[in-house]
C-alpha cells in the first residue's frame, strides 16, 4: 500500500527550506494514482530532486536560482496548497495558487485561515478569492509568531517546517493526530527542537 503523498509534502517543504538536505521517505511509487504526487514536479521549482527507488523516494536539495514568483493551478491537488504557500513564504517566492474552491469547505475555511496566519509574519500582501490565494513576500519574517490551527491538522503540519528559519509557536499541536499521529516525533528524529509550552 502506498503512503500518503499529502503527508509527504511537509518533508518536501522541510527539504526546500533547509540549506542542504537528503531525506528518505518510505513506500512511494513513481506511477502513483494520487493527485498529490505532482509534488515531485512542483518542488523541482524549489530545487528538490526526487529519486525513485524500489519502494521509497530520496529527496535531495540542490542549489538553484529561485523564481521571483510562481503561479500554480492546484484543482487536482488542493491539499498541497497550505504546504506550498508556506514553502514560498520561507523562501521569499511570491505565489498565486488557483483551483482552491474546495478549501473553503474543509476542516476550516483554509483560505481565510492561511490569510490570517501568514499576515502575522509581516508579509507585504495576502489576497484570497473564492478559489485562489496570492502571497507577496517581505524580506524579513517575524519571529515567534503564534500559529492558530483552527482544528485543522494541515495548518499545524504545513507551518511546522518554517521553524527551520524562525522560531514559531503552534497552538493545539495534537490536532495532527487526525492524519499523522507521529508527526512531531518524526520531526524530532530529523533534529527539530520541539518544546511543549504550558500556557
Where are these regions (language model features)?
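Short, structured segments at the rim of ligand-binding sites
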Residues: 1-199
Amino acid at each position: 500500500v502506498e503512503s500518503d503523498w499529502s503527508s509527504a509534502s511537509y518533508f518536501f517543504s522541510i527539504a526546500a527550506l533547509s540549506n542542504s538536505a537528503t531525506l528518505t521517505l518510505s513506500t512511494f511509487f513513481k506511477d502513483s494514482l494520487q493527485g498529490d504526487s505532482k509534488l515531485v514536479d512542483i518542488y523541482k521549482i524549489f530545487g528538490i530532486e526526487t529519486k525513485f527507488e524500489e519502494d521509497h523516494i530520496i529527496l535531495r536539495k540542490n542549489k538553484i536560482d529561485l523564481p521571483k514568483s510562481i503561479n500554480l493551478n492546484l484543482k487536482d491537488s488542493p491539499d498541497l496548497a497550505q504546504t506550498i504557500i508556506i514553502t514560498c513564504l520561507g523562501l521569499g517566492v511570491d505565489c498565486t495558487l488557483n483551483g482552491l474552491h474546495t478549501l473553503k469547505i474543509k476542516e476550516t475555511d483554509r483560505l481565510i485561515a492561511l490569510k490570517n496566519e501568514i499576515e502575522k509574519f509581516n508579509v507585504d500582501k495576502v489576497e484570497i478569492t473564492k478559489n485562489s490565494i496570492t502571497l507577496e513576500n517581505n524580506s524579513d519574517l517575524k519571529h515567534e509568531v503564534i500559529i492558530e490551527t483552527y482544528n485543522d491538522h494541515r495548518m499545524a503540519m504545513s507551518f511546522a517546517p518554517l521553524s527551520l528559519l524562525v522560531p514559531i509557536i503552534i497552538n493545539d499541536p495534537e490536532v495532527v493526530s487526525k492524519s499523522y499521529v507521529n508527526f512531531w516525533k518524526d520531526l524530532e528524529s530529523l533534529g527539530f527542537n520541539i518544546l511543549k509550552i504550558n500556557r
